[in-house]
């Protein structure tokens, strides 16, 4: 989870 709504990566967001 980095930042913001990362729609290209469900697990990261």
Swiss-Prot record:
Q: What is this protein called?
A: Snaclec ophioluxin subunit beta
Q: Which UniProt keywords apply?
A: Disulfide bond, Glycoprotein, Hemostasis impairing toxin, Platelet aggregation activating toxin, Secreted, Toxin
Its biological purpose: Binds to the platelet and collagen receptor glycoprotein VI (GP6) and activates platelet aggregation.
Q: Which family does it belong to?
A: Belongs to the snaclec family.
The molecular function terms in GO held by this entry are: toxin activity
Gene Ontology terms, cellular component aspect? extracellular region
On modification after translation, the UniProt record reads: May be glycosylated.
Q: What else is known?
A: Negative results: does not agglutinate fixed platelets.
Q: How does it assemble?
A: Heterodimer of subunits alpha and beta; disulfide-linked.
Query: Which domain of life does the UniProt lineage start with?
Result: Eukaryota
Which cell locations does it reside in?
Answer: Secreted
Does the keyword Secreted feature in the UniProt annotation?
A: yes
Extract the coiled-coil ranges from the record.
Answer: none
Using the record's annotation, list all stretches that form the C-type lectin domain: 11-13
Subcellular location, principal: secreted
Q: Does the keyword Glycoprotein apply?
A: yes
Q: In which tissues is it expressed?
A: Expressed by the venom gland.
């Amino acid at each position: 989870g980095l930042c913001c709504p990362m729609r290209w990566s469900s697990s990261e967001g």
